């Protein structure tokens, strides 16, 4: 098996950079325009999850009736599901499928005798991970890689006027150093690699002479805008023409540029001689007068580039036609992105291709819908993470003027341990192969701005065990990165190379252990999660300044930032307690907070050439148990099923678009814990007015980052109607948004505060809110984080049936300020005595009067953690209860506060 891997990779790599002769990893689909015959092989297929090929599977009479009937695109996986019951979900615990192994596909198609004399190609847009293909029992070849298109020459295997039996063996086994998929990237990554024939399959028939079908899935035609302005443009067109004719022949290769109306704008032609089994390569130049440039979202004008092969008598032998935008692109540290010489700041999102119910087997309409969601938010760029995406997203981006970051699946790990050097070399070759395929298949798309060669491989270097190296060793990805960067320049000198790193100058990692990847490629991206995995959200700006100071001549972007958010989890104060970056406590409001703070830092740093949010949509990954989901990364601005746009989505829509919009945040937090709330509204309107229960509570204008806040708004008992109205400068209504919040009687003129908690515990008797209304102190928990995919380690707290309520606490020097009606109140203080640590003694002062003394000091307790409650009566005279905790010995610690009138 290892020899086959090595041979296959060698064939592909060396064909381009100097390795060998024949290559079966071939071309991409193009428009046929009545010259090529193209048949979609979408259904019916039969599928069985099995590693064994039945001996008679190639026979027309083989009985596959017990196999699953499927249509292609297809994936056998269903991964990730939500735990809430607020809405119906396609995925449930009962119907998911995370199997990684081998599946067999079988179908039949027919060709009539009129197709004899043609050459026939089976084109697969993507099969994950390793595909082996047989037609009528004849082995056609294999492809190693989950994402790029490949073609196999089926000419000698087809039959006419009889069924053609097509069998595909798909190996999606999890890569290990010993597996059949060992060399096939990705070998790591925080996303699930779905198995199957998950993009379309078709049969293409050509004449003897045709544009090259064996060029790594590319179109065989590669056009580059050499220069362009509004007066003139020059386009270099490289075409590859293949002949299977038994004799030499002269053909004319004509290149045409058609405008959007189909009118000829520029043309050139050349006569060449082609011979049997030879591929001729020629370069031609188109000069275009008064071109209409492809100017991003401002004017995404598309021509059509057409290459026609003709016989001397004018008979058309082959024709390909693709959308083409005339544009140049450059990226510098001084000016950022220059599109046709004009500065363009890129702001957008990263995008994984899966969605609930389909996995990776999405339709073109699914992709169209996804891109529409991103574009409506105001994104002008998409990072296609962490692998090559299909043609639909590229075509849509061309039409809409979106700029794309394309990248290969070299993610986190690039090798196994030192004892596996043979397969490690094969992995490097597979990286080169997937890079060649990606560049050639997407070369003509004006939307593609950069070619990405890696994502966070510096992580594998700072954590050697991640790449199976011994602790203390220093595995180095830099040689491979330099190789790939140089290959990009050979493949396409018109676009910059790029990569995304994770760890440079992040305090979590010792700088000496982090490989310097920042200046290997022509541009660089930083994946940074301040306020989530490390540090505070406000740390991002100074960190970026540090990078810019260290690499002043390197164009730097932010390629990932953000936080997880569960739309069914809510907090009253994002700073009320610690967030669980790898666990369940991920309130929607904290996610929004991180985006607000991070975007403020990014938008104030013009030296950044681009930024991409992580991520547009929640996506599947079996490494996570977080938020309100299982096996889902919750950082998406939109849920996995596309049903909910989280609040952070509307923050960007307010800041990135001018089409009038208004959005009230925390709308899904309907049953309110507190009678007093800050109401936050995102809007791009000049004026925003807030109404509560039909009465105006004021207008806001020129809100910072288009975020308007009305502080300390008191809700009425029962139903509360909240409406935000966006107004023009003359006070005329442009747009409005309304929600309903509920304040139950038990919460009216009362407080139940779960101190130290960002998400309140569910208790036996009362409805507690998360920690809020505090001044000072520090949030803490007696529970310990469980880490990636593991539940927290719960502390054993004696003396209570509400363990979760006592598990979190606020400690140090702190107090609470609580608006209340005048009157008498019962105040209950919940706290824990830890007899295994130094004693703690503190007093409780309310409105400057001592109401409880010596909490902790007089409490008899068992060993370990013991729950206690002390009560006092407090009279409110001026509409406010001020509670302070005064240390006598050690630090005060309070787990909860309950305040009720009597």
What are these regions (language model features)?
Residues 208-244, 653-685, 749:
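Surface beta-strand/loop "capping" patches
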Residues 49-50, 83, 95, 100-214, ...:
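Accessory beta-strand-rich segments of carbohydrate-active enzymes
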């Amino acid at each position: 098996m290892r020899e086959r891997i090595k041979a296959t990779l060698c064939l592909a790599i060396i064909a381009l950079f100097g390795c060998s002769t024949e290559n079966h990893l071939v071309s991409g689909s193009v428009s046929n325009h009545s010259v090529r015959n193209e048949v979609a092989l979408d259904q019916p297929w039969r599928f069985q999850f099995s590693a064994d090929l039945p001996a008679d599977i190639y026979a027309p009479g083989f009985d596959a009736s017990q196999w699953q009937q499927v249509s292609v695109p297809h994936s056998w996986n269903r991964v990730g599901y939500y735990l809430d019951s607020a809405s119906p979900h396609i995925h449930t615990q009962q119907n998911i499928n995370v199997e990684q192994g081998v599946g067999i596909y079988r179908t039949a198609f027919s060709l009539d005798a009129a197709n004899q004399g043609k050459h026939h190609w089976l084109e697969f847009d993507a099969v994950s991970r390793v595909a082996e293909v047989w037609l009528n029992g004849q082995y056609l070849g294999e492809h190693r890689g989950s994402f790029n298109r490949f073609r196999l020459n089926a000419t000698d295997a087809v039959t006419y006027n009889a069924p053609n039996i097509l069998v595909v063996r798909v190996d999606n086994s999890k890569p290990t150093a010993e597996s059949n998929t060992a060399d096939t990237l990705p070998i790591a990554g925080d996303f699930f690699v779905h198995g199957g024939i998950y993009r379309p399959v078709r049969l293409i028939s050509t004449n003897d002479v045709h544009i090259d079908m064996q060029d790594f899935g590319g179109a065989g035609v590669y056009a580059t805008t050499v220069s362009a302005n509004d007066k003139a443009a020059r386009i270099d067109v490289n075409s590859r023409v293949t002949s299977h004719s038994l004799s030499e022949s002269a053909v004319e290769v004509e290149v045409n540029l058609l405008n959007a109306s189909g009118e000829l704008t520029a043309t050139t032609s050349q006569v060449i001689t082609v011979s049997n089994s030879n591929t001729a390569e020629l370069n031609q130049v188109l000069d275009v007068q008064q071109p209409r440039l492809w100017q991003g979202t401002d004017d995404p004008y598309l021509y059509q580039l057409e290459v026609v092969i003709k016989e001397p008598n004018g008979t058309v032998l082959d024709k390909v036609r693709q959308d083409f935008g005339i544009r140049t692109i450059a990226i510098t540290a001084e000016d950022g992105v220059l599109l046709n010489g004009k500065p363009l700041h890129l702001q957008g999102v990263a995008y994984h291709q899966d969605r609930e119910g389909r996995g990776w087997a999405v339709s073109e309409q699914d992709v169209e819908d996804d891109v529409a969601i991103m574009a409506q938010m105001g994104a002008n760029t998409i990072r296609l993470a962490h692998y090559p995406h299909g043609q639909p997203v590229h075509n849509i981006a061309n039409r809409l003027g979106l700029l794309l970051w394309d990248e290969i699946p070299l993610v986190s790990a690039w090798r196994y341990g030192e004892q596996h050097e043979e397969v490690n070399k094969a992995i490097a070759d597979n990286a080169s192969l997937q890079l060649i395929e990606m560049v050639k298949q997407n070369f003509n798309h004006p939307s593609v701005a950069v070619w990405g060669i890696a994502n966070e491989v510096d992580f594998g270097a700072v954590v050697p065990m991640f790449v199976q190296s011994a602790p203390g060793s220093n595995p180095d990805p830099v040689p491979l990165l330099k190789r790939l960067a140089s290959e990009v320049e050979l493949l396409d000198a018109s676009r910059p190379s790029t990569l995304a790193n994770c760890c440079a100058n992040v305090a979590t990692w010792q700088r000496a252990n982090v490989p310097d990847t920042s200046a290997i490629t022509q541009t660089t991206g930083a994946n940074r999660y301040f306020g989530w995995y490390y540090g505070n959200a406000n740390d991002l700006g100074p960190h970026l300044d540090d990078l810019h100071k260290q690499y002043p001549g390197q164009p730097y972007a932010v390629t990932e930032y953000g936080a997880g958010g569960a739309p069914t989890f809510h907090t009253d104060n994002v700073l009320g307690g610690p967030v669980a970056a790898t666990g369940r406590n991920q309130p929607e409001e904290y996610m929004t907070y991180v985006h607000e703070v991070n975007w403020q830092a990014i938008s104030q740093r013009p030296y950044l050439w681009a930024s991409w949010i992580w991520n547009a949509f929640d996506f599947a990954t079996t490494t996570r148990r977080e938020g309100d989901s299982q096996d889902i990364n919750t950082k998406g601005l939109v849920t996995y099923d596309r049903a909910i746009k989280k609040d952070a989505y509307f923050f960007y829509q307010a800041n990135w678009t001018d089409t009038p919009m208004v959005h009230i945040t925390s709308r899904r937090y309907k049953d309110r814990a507190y009678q007093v709330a800050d109401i936050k509204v995102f809007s791009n309107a000049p004026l925003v007015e807030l109404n509560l229960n039909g009465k105006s509570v004021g207008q806001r204008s020129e809100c910072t980052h288009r975020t308007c806040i009305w502080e300390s708004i008191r809700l009425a008992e029962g139903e509360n109607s909240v409406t935000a109205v966006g107004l023009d400068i003359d006070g005329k209504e442009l747009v409005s948004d309304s929600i309903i919040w509920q304040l139950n009687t038990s919460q009216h003129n009362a407080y139940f505060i779960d101190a130290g908690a960002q998400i309140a515990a569910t208790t036996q008797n009362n409805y507690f809110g998360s920690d809020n209304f505090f001044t000072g102190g520090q949030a803490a928990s007696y529970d310990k984080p469980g880490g990636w995919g593991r539940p927290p380690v719960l502390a054993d707290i004696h003396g209570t049936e509400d363990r979760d309520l006592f598990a979190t606490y606020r400690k140090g020097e702190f107090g609470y300020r609580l608006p209340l009606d005048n009157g008498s109140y019962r105040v209950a203080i919940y706290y824990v005595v830890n007899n295994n640590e130094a004693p703690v003694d503190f007093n409780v002062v309310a409105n400057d009067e001592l109401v409880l003394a010596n909490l902790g000091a007089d409490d008899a307790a068992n060993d370990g953690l013991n729950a206690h409650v002390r009560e006092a009566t407090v009279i409110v005279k001026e509409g406010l209860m001020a509670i302070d905790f005064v240390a006598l010995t050690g630090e005060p610690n309070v787990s909860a506060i309950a305040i009720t009138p009597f």
